[in-house]
């Protein structure tokens, strides 16, 4: 019976689609997420400014901001969310090699990712395009929907098995939820953002080859990453390989701009 419950849970997770729609039903609609994101972003920037961690004037900031402003109109052209994005950028003084985006177009860059990797403007555009694609495709919303579906399926499976399935049974269900939908779906979102970012930077006139040189730099920084199967991101090597496959299409867009 326990095995049947685990199987039932896995099938339930894998056959339910429409994670973004499920997020809407769970109360995480686009307008609400974007509003919450705007509030959090404003609070974060206020706190960073108070701690003198918000960069608004350095040469690194100016380079990041120039790329942001150049990509923004092309990102707006691709916005099919039904919500107008109030794109905003925060550059934080930090050695961290990181950048991220919040719903509704709130982009955060750390100075460390530019300075430590000695990025060109084209390489900055590769990161910026990647993050903007996450926002445009509402990947945060999709992840919320996916997690809600996972929790629903786990609940169904646990209920079907009975309340005394034991620690081993619970551990198996949790592992199944990770492998069945959580991590692979997240890697899929990252791959979609890589592709979308490649095309977005090309539309704005940045050389898509820079996306490959960016991840080659990341590879050297990270060292050997090992297998990507249980990683939330594709391995750097896998990323580079996928980008090489998508490069001809991106270069065709880029060359039309020249």
Pin down the residues of each PLM region.
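Hydrophobic helical h-region of N-terminal Sec-dependent signal peptides
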Residues: 9-13
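A Zn2+-metalloprotease active-site environment signal
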Residues: 4-7, 17-258
């Amino acid at each position: 019976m326990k095995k049947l419950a685990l199987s039932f849970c896995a099938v339930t997770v894998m056959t339910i689609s429409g994670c973004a729609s499920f997020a809407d039903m769970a109360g995480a609609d686009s307008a609400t997420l974007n509003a919450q994101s705007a509030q959090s972003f404003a609070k974060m920037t206020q706190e960073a400014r108070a701690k003198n961690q918000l960069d608004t004037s350095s040469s690194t900031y100016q380079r990041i901001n120039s790329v942001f402003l150049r990509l923004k109109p092309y990102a707006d052209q691709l916005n099919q969310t039904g919500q107008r994005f109030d794109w905003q950028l925060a550059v934080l003084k930090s050695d961290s090699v990181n950048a991220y985006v919040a719903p509704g177009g709130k982009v955060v860059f750390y100075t460390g990712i530019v300075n430590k990797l000695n990025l060109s403007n084209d390489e900055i555009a590769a990161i910026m395009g990647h993050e903007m694609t996450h926002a445009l495709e509402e990947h945060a919303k999709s992840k919320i929907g996916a997690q809600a579906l996972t929790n629903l399926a786990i609940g169904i499976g646990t209920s079907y098995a009975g309340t005394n399935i034991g620690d081993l049974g619970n551990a198996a269900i949790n592992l199944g939820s990770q492998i069945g939908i959580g991590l692979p779906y997240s890697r899929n979102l990252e791959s979609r953002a890589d592709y979308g970012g490649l095309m977005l930077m090309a539309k704005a006139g940045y050389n898509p080859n820079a996306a490959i040189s960016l991840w080659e730099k990341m590879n050297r920084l990270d060292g050997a990453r090992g297998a990507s199967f249980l990683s939330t991101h594709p391995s750097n090597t896998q990323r580079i390989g996928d980008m090489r496959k998508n490069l001809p299409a991106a270069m065709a867009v880029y060359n039309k701009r020249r």
